């Protein structure tokens, strides 16, 4: 492990992870049934259809590793059960429901709804990347556009998005011109996304970018360079002005309680009696696992 410095024999690691996964999946099924869960015909059909798609796409790899369609179907059905457990445990009628005010607080403090326009820090025709001076100029022009959005003072999300789109249309030709580029018909298209802290950490990797997003109030626009090749002209909006809490409940619960549920399932699975043959798993060297992508 590059962070902890710990080392492990690969075959031991594979055996351990295989057993933990099987134990956790068994715990998912046990918990689902204990809470009275039963998959609907539609859920089963959806899981089976996805399993067939996976088999169609990766069948050679699965077959080489001794995995058949029925195993994939069982796995996909367990994934449906796992998703359902989140609501069965933490939903409004769940075992330990999370109150609406807790969900709203998590939305406010740890999730970020943004309307944004992505600006490449390279010429899209020649793929010549901007140097530091060019990036600085592009960022300055984009921030001027963001300032105009803030000056417009839109009170609704619709107003804010309209102001963002208009500002982008006005600014993008000059921004693209820094790299001798030209805009396209969809350059000023506004996209919307609800980000978790994990999303922010993995996407806003440029120094200071994540904090720049976190510092924004609802309705506030900014230009943020998120990595070495992308600049966002964005406005942070109130998620509950875009969607209802019920519409967002599953996504918020997943971010808020997903890890807690997974930890509980892993712990429960480790305590379940089973007849898994750990010595048999240890006989499968990691080098015998077929990885088609490694051979392509």
Task: Label every PLM stretch briefly.
Residues 22-26, 38, 79, 151-158, ...:
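Residues at alpha-helix boundaries and the short loops/turns that link adjacent helices
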Residues 1-69:
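N-terminal targeting/tethering segments
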Residues 19-42, 183-184, 197-208, 213, ...:
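Extended amphipathic secondary-structure runs
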Residues 12, 16, 20, 25-33, ...:
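Solvent-exposed, polar/charged alpha-helical surfaces in well-ordered, non-transmembrane soluble domains
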Residues 63-137, 199-296:
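PPIase-associated folding chaperone regions across multiple families
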Residues 43-46, 132, 138-151, 156, ...:
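Solvent-exposed loop/turn and edge beta-strand elements of beta-rich ligand-binding domains
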Residues 27-28, 177, 278:
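Intrinsically disordered or highly flexible coil/loop and linker segments, enriched in small
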Residues 144-206:
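Peptidyl-prolyl cis-trans isomerase
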């Amino acid at each position: 492990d590059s962070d902890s410095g710990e080392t492990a024999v690969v075959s031991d690691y594979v055996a351990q992870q295989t057993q933990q996964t099987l134990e956790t999946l068994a715990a998912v099924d046990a918990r689902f049934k204990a809470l009275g869960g039963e998959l609907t015909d539609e859920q089963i059909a959806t899981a089976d259809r996805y399993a067939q798609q996976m088999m169609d796409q990766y069948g050679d790899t699965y077959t080489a590793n001794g995995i058949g369609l029925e195993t994939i179907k069982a796995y996909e059905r367990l994934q449906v059960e796992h998703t359902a457990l989140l609501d069965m445990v933490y939903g409004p009628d769940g075992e330990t429901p999370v109150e609406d005010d807790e969900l709203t607080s998590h939305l406010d403090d740890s999730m970020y709804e943004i309307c944004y326009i992505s600006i490449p820090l390279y010429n899209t025709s020649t793929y010549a990347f901007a140097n530091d001076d060019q990036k600085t100029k592009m960022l300055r022009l984009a921030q001027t556009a963001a300032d105009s959005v803030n000056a417009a003072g839109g009170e609704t999300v619709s107003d804010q998005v309209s102001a963002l789109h208009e500002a982008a249309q006005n600014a993008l030709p000059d921004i693209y011109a820094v790299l001798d580029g030209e805009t396209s018909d969809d350059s000023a298209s506004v996209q919307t996304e609800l980000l978790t802290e994990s999303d922010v950490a993995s996407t806003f990797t440029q120094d200071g970018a994540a904090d720049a997003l976190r510092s924004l109030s609802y309705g506030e626009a900014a230009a943020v360079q998120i990595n070495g090749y992308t600049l966002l002209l964005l406005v942070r909006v109130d998620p509950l002005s875009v969607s209802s809490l019920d519409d967002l409940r599953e996504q918020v619960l997943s971010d808020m309680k997903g890890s807690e549920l997974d930890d509980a399932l892993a712990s429960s699975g480790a305590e379940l009696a089973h007849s898994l043959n750990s010595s048999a798993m240890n006989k499968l060297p990691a080098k015998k696992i077929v990885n088609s992508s490694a051979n392509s």
